Amino acid sequence: MVKKQNCVAMLLAGGKGSRLSALTKNLAKPAVPFGGKYRIIDFTLSNCSNSGIETVGILTQYQPLELHNYIGIGNAWDLDRVNGGVTVLPPYAEASGVKWYTGTASAIYQNMNFLRQYNPEYVLILSGDHIYKMDYSKMLDYHIAKEADVSISVIEVPWDEASRFGIMNTNEEMEIVEFEEKPQFPKSNLASMGIYIFNWAILKEYLEMDARNPDSSNDFGKDVLPLLLDEGKKLIAYPFQGYWKDVGTVKSLWEANMDLLRDESLLQLNDHEWRVYSVNPNEPPQFISETAKVEESLINEGCIIEGEVRHSVLFQGVTVDEGSKVIDSVVMPGAHIGKNVVIEKAIVGPGMVIEDGEVIRSEKNTDDVVLIAEGI
């Protein structure tokens, strides 16, 4: 396991998530509900805890209030430590004014003092908006064994989707020889997962160089990594095999929730050897009435089910009244589904009230996912 004095994690959690539409109107993307009882950020924080990483800086910016309240002091993930633990790092004001994070590299650069107080040998940089399980200590062992300056976790994606990602072109030793940001004609299908391990000395040097460059967009993928390659630093690709999902769109968020219902899913929430931790909602047990019918679904605590629920994910405190059908759908916390409602292939946002007799399904394209949320 990683020793906290050797490796400090910096978790980027300030993204707006605009492609999630109304779900992120008043909520940071990492705080979006997922999987019946979790938030997206739970997966990265649980990975840190399970990997033995005990010092985590969480960099927030967009609509941070609910995310800050949710994280608290990190006790849900066993990260409430006297030394280290979780520290929330929002942008702050200097004499010259508030300095907003302008890119991923800018966010880390503006929190160099946080890293300096620990003076780690390695810095693990993470994104708080992906769904996956990963042992970061194995990646660190790989980084050390390869004597790398930077290691980047990569995953094979379908060739017809490779142009959507930052693509790493490597040699036979998995050394990265070229980085292409969303190439039209990709040479490789190794996509960056946005997970980096830097030697601390290298990170300091190149973040300072990037900050001095007036033409930089202050982004790791666009600016810092290409600069490292140009200067001959050793960048290594770390191949990851397992479930990984970028839930940046309404459809991909729905797909990831549906993946949990598959018998052969690579993402198992009931794996006691690698638990996914979350904040307990403290709701009473769910109630399934005699009029209810539930098949192949995740029903969280506090739910009252009087209608039919099939192949769906229901969060805490959801009510489905008699005569209603919820099929292939995700219903987020506190939503109330009235009587004789039909909901099919949809996401119902937190606290939404669906009136009696409503029919919610896509009429134009059966491949669409309908989003019902405040602000739509």
From Swiss-Prot:
**Is the Nucleotidyltransferase keyword given for this protein?**
yes
Cysteine pairs bridged by disulfides in the record = none
The GO terms this record gives for MF are: ATP binding; glucose-1-phosphate adenylyltransferase activity
UniProt EC number: 2.7.7.27
Positions contributing to alpha-D-glucose 1-phosphate binding: 101, 166, 181-182, 192
Please, which domain of life does this record's source organism belong to?
Bacteria
What's this chain's function? Involved in the biosynthesis of ADP-glucose, a building block required for the elongation reactions to produce glycogen. Catalyzes the reaction between ATP and alpha-D-glucose 1-phosphate (G1P) to produce pyrophosphate and ADP-Glc.
Family under the similarity heading: Belongs to the bacterial/plant glucose-1-phosphate adenylyltransferase family.
Tell me the subunit arrangement.
Answer: Homotetramer.
This protein is called Glucose-1-phosphate adenylyltransferase
